[in-house]
Amino acid sequence: MIWHVQNENFILDSTRIFMKAFHLLLFDGSFIFPECILIFGLILLLMIDSTSDQKDIPWLYFISSTSLVMSITALLFRWREEPMISFSGNFQTNNFNEIFQFLILLCSTLCIPLSVEYIECTEMAITEFLLFVLTATLGGMFLCGANDLITIFVAPECFSLCSYLLSGYTKKDVRSNEATMKYLLMGGASSSILVHGFSWLYGSSGGEIELQEIVNGLINTQMYNSPGISIALIFITVGIGFKLSLAPSHQWTPDVYEGSPTPVVAFLSVTSKVAASASATRIFDIPFYFSSNEWHLLLEILAILSMILGNLIAITQTSMKRMLAYSSIGQIGYVIIGIIVGDSNGGYASMITYMLFYISMNLGTFACIVLFGLRTGTDNIRDYAGLYTKDPFLALSLALCLLSLGGLPPLAGFFGKLHLFWCGWQAGLYFLVSIGLLTSVVSIYYYLKIIKLLMTGRKQEITPHVRNYRGSPLRSNNSIELSMIVCVIASTILGISMNPIIAIAQDTLF
């Protein structure tokens, strides 16, 4: 008798939960239509994989890419609509969130063709790889639109769990296993620190979890200048600093970059920074509105450390992926300038513009590294010597992307940094901008050092890897070259036509 009562209660509770979920999707589902497209793509992937054979592998790539393109299209149709809050205040749709979601989808769309040949050569499991990439993309999109502390914590964990699995995807590689372990342990620690900061914010605001309601709660409780808010700020900054690879929370980055499969590194190097930047902007600007001087100072210190350490240590690296890891630490220091400047002086617009340029520059560089690695089996910078004599197209593409990362005119990286630094200078961040300019000069040195190696024609400097260089026999290499060409063109010409991009970025609102 007792068992029957408990069973009936369980069925009733389950029915209520299901009906509530159905009600939310029915009335609020239109607000997450781009995300629903990705979810449908994930289900379709699993269905095809469970009912098909090896001949249907191209369909898996097609479904993944089509889902991402359709999601981008849905986002573009929703552009300029009125800001809306849905799912009982958990999710917000506005232009600011959507432009970051667009950047994440763009990253994933370019990363899938970049991965095709690598997966075939290394015989990695295709369905699981695409599943993790799409799920991580979904987590990043939900993070961009998150409007409460719970969603801001759960969404990046969805992204992080997929990132841990992707970084250790080549299970037989010892370096990949080491990278996964370090990433998992430090990621878990940073998440604990982040949620501890959220608990202080929750308690200080009188039990509020929505970002705007936290501000109102702090006013009502008169806790906006309390020590609890300072403690929350420190813990949250440390947690977000890990996600952004800000110094001194950057130690995991070089090892994960070096040990993970190269297409995975390409994916993580841009999507994680885009999603974390969107989240950081809203967290610092809304709940910590009354502590703007404190978080400005804190972020300035971290940005200076990142720019100096990242670019100086990058000079000493012998691995291309480790060099790009330290370079990315320096690059995120430049992005922080836009977050500190804020919306009043065009800081957010300059940050978004530079993020778009960084995606093209970074993914273009990684596409070149994937191609070179598949054809030579090496990642050592020294082994790139003389590549121009064997593959001029690949060498020139890599050189253009590196020059753009360094910020040399007339490439996109130059105009992106120029606008970012100019906004910082107008906002009075003279010391921070000066450090940014000096470290940019340092970065040009190690990029030019690689380009000099690429173009060398002296036989004694050319290593056996380039001497025995061969083109890939696989027909799928066109997909990598397609991603590479798109990124190289974007890295070259986007800067010239950046005024429309800035105008679109300035149209973003919270």
Curated annotation (Swiss-Prot):
Belongs to the complex I subunit 2 family. It comes from Citrus sinensis. It comes from the Eukaryota. It is a multi-pass membrane protein. NCBIfam families: NDH_I_N, PRK02504.1. It catalyses: a plastoquinone + NADH + (n+1) H(+)(in) = a plastoquinol + NAD(+) + n H(+)(out); a plastoquinone + NADPH + (n+1) H(+)(in) = a plastoquinol + NADP(+) + n H(+)(out). This is NAD(P)H-quinone oxidoreductase subunit 2 A, chloroplastic. It is an enzyme of class 7 (translocase). NDH shuttles electrons from NAD(P)H:plastoquinone, via FMN and iron-sulfur (Fe-S) centers, to quinones in the photosynthetic chain and possibly in a chloroplast respiratory chain. The immediate electron acceptor for the enzyme in this species is believed to be plastoquinone. Couples the redox reaction to proton translocation, and thus conserves the redox energy in a proton gradient. InterPro entries: NADH-Q_OxRdtase_suN/2, ND/Mrp_TM, Ndh2_N. It is found in: Plastid, Chloroplast thylakoid membrane. Coiled coil: none annotated. The keyword Phosphoprotein does not apply.
